[in-house]
């Protein structure tokens, strides 16, 4: 053997490594079988193992050829030079395998590069190397000379450690004229060898006889064993004790208590006196274990239990007993006691769990084997018959594969999110009475699979963002939960890309993949994009990944970032100023011109008001401008003191915070009456255009009066009843003037398609009252009137907890806070009913909010109604409220009678400017605001002040 082989084979770790590699790697194909006789000398040739395995001799050392054995590994060795398997040390078959019929040495041949494992079995052939052996080499017999012929003397037979023919024994007795040897042919356990007296003894001729019993096996060469018999011939006691039966068969229950009588032996002796007195004992060849378990009474012959009787250890006892008399010499009688141990159920079953496959995937199919379970019970018959069962309410079952072996299999689908692990209790119960049982617990862990998609708390979220936000501002955070575990629950977020107009959604917003935070990437413009609706996808990290979507509705709230824009006028002079010719003979109330303006914003930010700008120290101007109409009219009769040329500056202001303004210039030339035809020719154009607008407005007034008829009738009736108790009577007819106006905060600017005409309460119908409803759907006007009437008749304290719902707040681009809300009084000392004012912020902590009723026509430009003081102007005793609200419209209508000198300034009605629809046009107007102010003038419509 080479040094390399010696190095790997004589170190302890070499064997361990070889066994490990044997267990891991797939063995080579085929199996070699050799045979070698036992007791072969060192170096005995066994086989050319390298050649038989197909290995070259030159590759044995480089490939680390080595041999491992689970048995004694030093018995055989391989010469790495020639590849021959040879005997390395003494092989004793009896020591190696005992009396087993088959005896083999199993070798594992291992080579590396690549790793291969070969199985080699070497059969050890038995040789006749063990002679027959008697229990004793000498035996003394005492035979009376008076012994009758044909007596039998029992002899213990020999035993041979070999097997097969090598252990087949034949017996021969040395030549004797008195004795012969009788060899039993059947039932060796019952009948031992018998030495037969064939001729009466004559003590006087031979007092002693020496015979040799020779046992010869069947091997080649034959081996023998001898038993020397020393026979003493006695003179008297010629009758040996005799048992009534040669074989006694007894049944004994296991676990019998000590002292339990097993059997009482009965032997008789025909002799008299001491020759007939019998003593009982176990035979000399009884094992120490038998003597420790049983006790025989020498006088009575009773055999009693003296130790533990265990069926599982020994189920049959074979005891040789003898009876000897007190003669001289004593005579012996022999018998055999066969004690059969009866089993009782004294052993509980044992459960062994093997091949546990954990964890179990939650999507494992039904029938998947989880574990192999074996049970055993050392008892016999029904006491050893074991049945197994499982704890209830588990998705598993036991399937019997073969006797005492079960498979724990999946019986129904698993769901880790419902139950992550199971504690399965296996119960094994035998068939004894009473039955014994044992339990074993198997913990089954359920491994997660990606079977749950991330889920959002809501399918849709509504978000409000002010326009002109800084880039990168955090808008909202979406959160999705995943019921899975580990990476299957790791959620990432992304946008569902789409186009918004001509641009991609990702140019507007982005979402953080891990946190779900949504950011606005650029400033949003309410005028360009009021609603940005998109979807966010949440995906987990499982394979395959699962995901779900959530919809985000981002409403862009309006800010006052657009100044009012003047609309062009038909007669624009140099420098963009509007030129008008007015005869000096015209009376008070004559409309000179009208300034028109629009605001691209919405809501409160688009509510416009008009006012004249006067120079400091200037005389009282004969002109005024309608606060909400933009109409420039004459306040008194013109005289010679008035300058012939009047330059009027009209300031147009919205009501945003801060307010934005625009200025219009109107040049008014006063002409004499004889120049009126010329002036009329210059003004004829606008008057003709106004007449056409009057016709249109008449229809609008009729339409809105029809829609609001119920409300108007209610208001007229209520006002008539209230006015009858006041010093100054107010009616809605031509007799008593009733002023209908808005508060001093301005007008709404909406597209002209939304304007409606309403009827004023003073004189004949006019065309200067314009009321607007924020996107009121058709057919809802009468319902609003009914609600207003109920409030008048049965005032109630409002609920301060009313709030907008999220859907109504979604479109609040801005809201209007009318600080001068009217208070309706019932009379002196009567209860006050505060009317709701339109507000976007309620500074008073006690103020409440109320959502408009469903179906009231409120769209994204919704109002927030506030019940509270609102800093109102208190009315004196007996006075009517200053203003009230037309339902469905942001206009505040005043029904309070004012002195004649104040009616001029408070009889203006609101107008609405045209809202720009595109961002491109708004930016153009913002960039050229100063130039547009000069280019745009006033235009006169049919509307005139009241």
From Swiss-Prot:
Chief localization: membrane
Extra information: The protocadherins alpha are expressed from a single gene cluster similarly to immunoglobulin and T-cell receptors. The N-terminal region containing the 6 extracellular cadherin domains, unique to each protocadherin alpha, is encoded by one of the large exons found in tandem array within the gene cluster. The C-terminal region, identical to all protocadherins alpha, is encoded by 3 shared exons.
Keyword Repeat on entry: yes
Protein keywords: Calcium, Cell adhesion, Cell membrane, Glycoprotein, Membrane, Repeat, Signal, Transmembrane, Transmembrane helix
Protein's job: Potential calcium-dependent cell-adhesion protein. May be involved in the establishment and maintenance of specific neuronal connections in the brain.
Signal peptide range in chain numbering: 1-30
Sample GO molecular function, one term: calcium ion binding
Biased composition, class Basic and acidic residues, residue ranges: 905-919
Name recorded for this polypeptide: Protocadherin alpha-10
UniProt repeat feature PXXP, residue ranges: 734-737, 774-777, 795-798, 828-831, 869-872, 887-890
GO cellular component: membrane; plasma membrane
């Amino acid at each position: 053997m080479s040094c390399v082989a010696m190095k790997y084979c004589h170190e302890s770790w070499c064997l361990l490594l070889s066994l490990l590699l044997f267990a891991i790697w797939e063995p080579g194909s085929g199996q070699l079988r050799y045979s070698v006789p036992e007791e072969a000398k060192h170096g005995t040739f066994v086989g050319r193992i390298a050649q038989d395995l197909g290995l070259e001799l030159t590759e044995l050392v480089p490939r680390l050829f080595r041999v491992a054995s689970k048995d004694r590994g030093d018995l055989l060795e391989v010469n790495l030079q020639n590849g021959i398997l040879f005997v390395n040390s003494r092989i004793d078959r009896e020591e190696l395998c005992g009396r087993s019929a088959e005896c083999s040495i199993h070798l594992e041949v291992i080579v590396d590069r690549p790793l291969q494992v070969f199985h080699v079995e070497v059969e050890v052939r038995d040789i006749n190397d063990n002679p027959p052996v008697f229990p004793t080499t000498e035996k003394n017999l005492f035979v009376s000379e008076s012994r009758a012929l044909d007596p039998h003397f029992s002899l213990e037979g020999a035993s041979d450690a070999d097997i097969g023919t090598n252990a087949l024994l034949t017996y021969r007795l040395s030549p004797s004229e008195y004795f012969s040897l009788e060899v039993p042919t059947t039932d060796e356990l019952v009948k031992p060898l018998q030495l037969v007296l064939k001729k009466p003894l004559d003590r006087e001729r031979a007092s002693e006889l020496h015979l040799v019993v020779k046992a010869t096996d069947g091997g080649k060469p034959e081996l023998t064993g001898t038993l020397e018999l020393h026979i003493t011939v006695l003179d008297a006691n010629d009758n040996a004790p005799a048992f009534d039966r040669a074989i006694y068969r007894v049944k004994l229950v296991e676990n019998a208590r000590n002292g339990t009588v097993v059997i009482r032996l009965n032997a008789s002796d025909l002799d008299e006196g001491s020759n007939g007195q019998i003593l009982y004992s176990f035979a000399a060849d009884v094992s120490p274990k038998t003597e420790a378990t049983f006790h025989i009474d020498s006088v009575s012959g009773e055999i009693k239990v003296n130790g533990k009787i265990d069926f599982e250890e020994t189920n049959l006892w074979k005891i040789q007993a003898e009876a000897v008399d007190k003669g001289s010499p004593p005579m012996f009688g022999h018998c055999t006691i066969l004690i059969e141990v009866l089993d009782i159920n004294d052993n509980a079953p044992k459960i062994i769990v093997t091949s546990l496959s954990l964890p179990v995937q939650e999507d494992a199919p039904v029938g998947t084997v989880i574990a192999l379970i074996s049970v055993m019970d050392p008892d016999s018959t029904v006491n050893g018959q074991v049945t197994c069962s499982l704890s209830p309410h588990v998705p598993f079952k036991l399937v019997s594969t073969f006797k005492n072996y079960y498979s724990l299999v999946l019986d129904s689908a698993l769901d880790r999110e419902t139950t992550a692990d199971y504690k399965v209790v296996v119960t094994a119960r035998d068939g004894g009475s009473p039955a014994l049982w044992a339990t074993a617990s198997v913990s089954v862990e359920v491994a997660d699979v990606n079977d749950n998609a991330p889920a959002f708390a809501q399918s849709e979220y509504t978000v409000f963002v002010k326009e002109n936000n800084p880039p990168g501002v955090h808008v909202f955070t979406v959160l999705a939960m995943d019921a899975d575990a580990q990476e299957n629950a790791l959620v990432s977020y992304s946008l569902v890309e789409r186009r918004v107009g001509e641009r991609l959604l990702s140019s507007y917003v982005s979402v953080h993949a891990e946190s779900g935070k949504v950011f606005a990437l650029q400033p949003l413009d309410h005028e360009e994009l009021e609603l940005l609706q998109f979807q966010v996808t949440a995906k987990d990290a499982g394979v395959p990944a699962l995901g779900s979507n959530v919809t985000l509705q981002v409403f862009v709230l309006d800010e006052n970032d657009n100044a009012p824009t003047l609309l062009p006028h038909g007669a624009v002079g140099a420098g963009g100023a509007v030129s008008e010719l007015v005869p000096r003979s015209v009376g008070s109330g004559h409309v000179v011109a009208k300034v028109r303006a629009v605001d691209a914003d919405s809501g409160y930010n688009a509510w416009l008001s008009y006012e004249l700008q006067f120079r400091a120290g200037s005389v009282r101007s004969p002109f005024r401008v309608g606060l909400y109409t933009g109409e420039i009219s004459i306040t008194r009769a013109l005289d010679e003191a008035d300058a012939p040329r009047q330059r009027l500056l009209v300031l147009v202001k919205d009501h945003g915070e801060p307010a934005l303004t625009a200025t219009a210039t109107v040049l008014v030339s006063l002409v004499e009456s004889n120049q009126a035809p010329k002036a009329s020719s210059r003004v004829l154009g606008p008057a003709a255009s106004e007449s056409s607008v009057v016709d249109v407005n008449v229809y609008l007034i009729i339409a809105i009066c029809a829609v609001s008829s119920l409300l108007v009738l209610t208001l007229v009736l209520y006002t008539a009843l209230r006015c009858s108790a006041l010093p100054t009577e107010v009616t809605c007819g031509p007799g008593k003037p009733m002023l209908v106006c808005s508060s001093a905060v301005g007008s709404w600017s909406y597209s002209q398609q939304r304007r409606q005409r309403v009827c004023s309460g003073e004189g004949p119908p006019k065309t200067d009252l314009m009321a607007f409803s924020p996107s009121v759907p058709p057919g809802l006007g009468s319902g609003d009137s009914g609600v207003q009437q109920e409030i008048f008749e049965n005032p109630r304290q409002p609920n301060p907890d009313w709030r907008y719902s999220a859907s109504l707040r979604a479109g609040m681009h801005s809201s209007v806070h009318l600080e001068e809300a009217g208070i309706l009084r019932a009379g002196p000392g009567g209860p006050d009913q505060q009317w709701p004012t339109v507000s976007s912020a309620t500074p008073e902590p006690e103020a409440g909010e109320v959502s408009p009723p469903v179906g009231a026509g409120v769209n994204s430009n919704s109002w927030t109604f506030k019940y509270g003081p609102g800093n109102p102007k208190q009315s004196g005793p007996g006075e009517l409220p200053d203003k009230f609200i037309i339902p469905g419209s942001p206009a505040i209508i005043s029904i309070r009678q004012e002195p004649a000198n104040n009616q001029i300034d408070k009889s203006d009605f609101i107008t609405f400017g045209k809202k720009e629809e595109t961002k491109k046009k708004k930016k153009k107007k913002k960039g050229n605001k100063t130039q547009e102010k000069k280019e745009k003038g006033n235009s006169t419509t049919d509307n005139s002040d009241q």
